[in-house]
Amino acid sequence: MKTLIKICGIKRLDDLECAIQNGADLIGFVFVKSSPRYIEPSSVTNLLQSVPEKIKTVAVMQHATQNDLDSILDAFKPTYIQTDANDFTSLDLPSNIKKIRVYREEEDFDISSIDDESLALLEGPISGSGQMVNKEFLKKACKRKRLLIAGGLSPENIQSILKEVKPYGVDVSSGVESSRGNKS
C-alpha cells in the first residue's frame, strides 16, 4: 500500500507545483497566524486553480474557533480540516468536510484515545517546530492505528522512517524548506 504524502505550509505557486510533481496526495494550507507558513484564506483561491482534482486540500488550524473556520469556508472548501483533536467538539463542520485530528506525543498520551472515523496525525509537542516524535513510540502507535506522522521529517530521514515505522502517511513541512515558510 502506498504511503499517503501530505506537504504542509504551501504559500506559493512554485511550492504547490513542486509538491504535486513530487507525489503529494494532500496539500496543507496553514491558517495559524503565528506560523511562518500562514496564508490568508483569500490567497488560497488563486492557488487552488493549479490543484488537480485527485489532490486533496487541508485547512490546517490550531485551537480553531467557529469564526476562524467560517472565514476559511467562505474562501474555499477544503477536503479536510486539521486541528487539535479536542477542538472539533466546539466546531460545526459541514458533513462533506473530513477531519484530521491532531494528537501530540505527551507523557499521558493514550493511543486508544484516537478514534477510527477520521484521519489522525501524531506529532511532537509543538506544531511546526520540526521536533520528531520518539521513533519507538511511533512504531508501536503505527502498528495499532492508521496514523499520519509529522515532525522532523526530511528527505534525509524519510526513507528510514518509512521502513522502520511504517506509517499510513507522512506530513512534511519544515523538512523541505530552504528558509522558514519557503519550500525548496
Residue ranges and their predicted role:
Residues 1-184:
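Conserved N-terminal beta1-alpha1 strand-loop-helix module at the mouth
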